[in-house]
Amino acid sequence: MKGYLVAIFLSSIFLYYVLYCILWGTNGYWFPAEEMRTRNNVNNCFKKPAFANLLRFPQLYPFLCRADFIKVAAMSGTNNFPLPYGIKTFETYFSSALSKLQSCDLFDEFDRVPCKRCVVVGNGGVLKNKTLGATIDSYDVIIRMNNGPVLGHEEEVGTRTTFRLFYPESVFSDSSHYDPNTTAVLVVFKPQDLRWLVEILLGKKINTQGFWKTPALKLIYKQYQIRILDPYITSEAAFQMLRFPRVFPKDQKPKHPTTGIIAITMAFHICSEVHLAGFKYNFYSPNSPLHYYGNATMSLMKQNAYHNLTAEQLFLNDIIKKKMVINLT
């Protein structure tokens, strides 16, 4: 009888182990954990991030890969929605663009830092005269966005860039800003963005129709440096971080997250610790600088009908107050 009970006990332990592996040994897309770690080139970080509960799929791979983006979309649900936050009806556009890229890798194969400290550097004027450059450069991963320059602002924002999120309308075209160590991540909002990427990589004449301003007519980054962000990240920024409605009233223009909020959401998926810099806006001073570069003022941002800066500031204040992230500015 005693041996029988021991056998039952051992069987229970084994069954628990199997169920544990099934439930926790895969990420939100049902990729085996070892496969995902290999794909990410990141070792396991056993420290649970402070922001982990914000994410539905904590181990989501942030970039699309041609070999499996259809399968991944079916798992995450982005196959049920058209652009800007899904791939429905535009699968061939994505496939065509992804086929022109040389890689969908996240980190360099030699990068084996298990728990990554990341800083997301916004473009806010609050960075002016802060001399945070050396501090920013000390992080494992540095995420920037759009055409926020490093050149000429090294003392304020540092010199290194790991990832730079961009749109066709906001990417650098001046080769003086080129950095061979940067991975440039396209955030897709419309089919024209994918068409633009194909045309620019093939050296074709750029069709500029359908953009809110003239897109870049040349790309300073090499083919191996380009990635396409999974629309799920943008969807998550809009619906889970900012709590935007999926359908806006007919008398309201739909609101979309800024590149900064999208960058923070991406950081939550690849980092164990996230710090922020340059995300504070002075709404009460319309003449205060909008960016740490250039002459634009806050009055310009207040005219933007496509973003909800109040919702974004509430979100940022909340995650800072709850110590999910650390704010450097």
From Swiss-Prot:
Highest rank taxon of the organism: Eukaryota
Intervals, Cytoplasmic compartment: 1-4
Signal peptide positions (record): none
Reactions catalysed: a neolactoside nLc4Cer(d18:1(4E)) + CMP-N-acetyl-beta-neuraminate = a neolactoside IV(3)-alpha-NeuAc-nLc4Cer(d18:1(4E)) + CMP + H(+); a beta-D-galactosyl-(1->4)-N-acetyl-beta-D-glucosaminyl derivative + CMP-N-acetyl-beta-neuraminate = an N-acetyl-alpha-neuraminyl-(2->3)-beta-D-galactosyl-(1->4)-N-acetyl-beta-D-glucosaminyl derivative + CMP + H(+); a neolactoside nLc6Cer(d18:1(4E)) + CMP-N-acetyl-beta-neuraminate = a neolactoside VI(3)-alpha-NeuNAc-nLc6Cer(d18:1(4E)) + CMP + H(+)
GO biological process: cellular response to interleukin-6; glycolipid biosynthetic process; protein glycosylation
One cellular component term from this protein's GO annotations in UniProt: Golgi membrane
Enzyme class (EC, first level): transferase
Coiled-coil regions, chain positions: none
Keyword Nucleus: no
Recorded GO MF terms: N-acetyllactosaminide alpha-2,3-sialyltransferase activity; sialyltransferase activity
Lumenal topological domain residue ranges: 26-329
Major localization listed first in the record, in broad terms: Golgi
Pfam family, one: Glyco_transf_29
EC nos: 2.4.3.6
Compartments reported by the entry: Golgi apparatus membrane
Membrane topology value: Single-pass type II membrane protein
Residues with attached carbohydrate: N129, N181, N295, N308
Keywords: Glycoprotein, Glycosyltransferase, Golgi apparatus, Membrane, Signal-anchor, Transferase, Transmembrane, Transmembrane helix
Ranges that cross the membrane: 5-25
Described function: Transfers the sialyl residue from CMP-N-acetyl-beta-neuraminate to the terminal galactose residue on sugar chains of glycoproteins and glycolipids. It's alpha-2,3-sialyltransferase activity is specific toward type II glycan chains (Galbeta1-4GlcNAc) on glycoproteins and glycolipids such as neolactosides nLc4Cer and nLc6Cer, whose sialyl-products serve as precursors for the Lewis X antigen. Critically involved in the synthesis of functional selectin ligands needed for neutrophil recruitment during inflammation and lymphocyte homing to the lymph nodes.
UniProt similarity note: Belongs to the glycosyltransferase 29 family.
Protein name: Type 2 lactosamine alpha-2,3-sialyltransferase
Gene source species: Mus musculus (Mouse)
Gene field: St3gal6
